[in-house]
From Swiss-Prot:
It comes from Escherichia coli (strain K12). This is Uncharacterized HTH-type transcriptional regulator RhmR. It comes from the Bacteria. Part of the rhmRDTA operon involved in L-rhamnonate utilization. Residues 28-47 bind DNA.
Length: 260
């Protein structure tokens, strides 16, 4: 029997969803008998849950969970505290590489650090949690921009104020478009002293359950610490770390999907 509730209709709807999640697709009769819901009430709830896309009918006329639940779970996962999810993974990456690590996000066309992980052995870089980032001069900024929807990306690029901070800074939209295309192809970005001449950075994207960009991580060092040979090694480590965080958010790689 259902427990008493001040909102019995809501309780019964949740019980229906939990029942189908537990035993799989089932008929209206099974739902009514198992939960002890009056027939008229059950059909009202089932029809409303279908209308709201929480439920659907399969080819055998059994009720099954449907797309609205997937959408809601994706939103919930994407809003989980990224900092606490990422902190142990970034700490491990810092321990492995001996370099400073960041987690950054893009919001309303601007990028920010939301987590900085360092030790006494890492270099001192002018960064802090909450610091805004250049979207065209930093590795993590370019990474965040590379995976924006095309229209959003173009709008952001059109609004950029270009400043040549170092000899390697990108200073033209066409250069940036080419760089972003290269980043998407290789799966990671690189700051070749484009914001600070002596600083190098490798960054990789973090995705959610809907395969949408959620954040990016970066590994930062001096030009002596991150040479071309070590850069490629760091890229592999950064990608692996970013994928670990992505999986915690419900993301699945093509290999995960093939195995499931």
């Amino acid at each position: 029997m259902l427990e008493s509730s001040k909102v019995p209709a809501l309780t019964r709807a949740i019980d229906i969803l939990n029942l189908i999640a537990r035993i799989g697709p089932c008929s209206a009769a099974t739902i009514i008998d198992t939960l002890g819901i009056p027939k008229s009430t059950a059909y009202l709830l089932l029809n409303e849950l279908r209308r709201q896309r929480f439920l659907s009918l399969d080819h055998q006329e059994n009720f099954c969970l449907w797309t609205r639940l997937v959408e809601l779970s994706g939103h919930a996962l994407s809003k989980m505290d990224l900092r606490e999810l990422a902190r142990p993974r970034l700490t491990q990456l810092m321990d492995t590489t001996g370099l400073l690590c960041h987690l950054g996000i893009i919001d309303n066309g601007s990028a920010y650090y939301i987590l900085k992980v360092e030790s006494s052995a890492t270099i001192s870089v002018r960064s802090h949690e909450g610091k805004s980032l250049s979207l065209y001069r930093s590795g993590i900024g370019k990474c965040l921009l590379a995976w924006q929807p095309a229209a959003v990306q173009q709008s952001i690029i059109e609004g950029l104020v270009w400043e040549q901070a170092t000899p390697t800074t990108i200073t033209h939209p066409q250069q940036l478009h080419e760089e972003l295309a290269r980043i998407r192809r290789q799966g990671w970005s690189y700051d070749n002293g484009e914001d600070y001449a002596d600083v190098r950075c490798v960054a990789a994207p973090v995705f959610n359950a809907n395969n949408e960009l959620t954040a990016a991580i970066s590994v930062v060092g001096t030009r002596l610490q991150i040479n071309e040979e070590y850069r490629d090694y760091l890229a592999g480590k950064a990608i692996a770390c970013a994928r670990d965080i992505s999986r915690l958010l419900g993301w699945k790689s093509p290999f995960d999907l093939q195995a499931s």
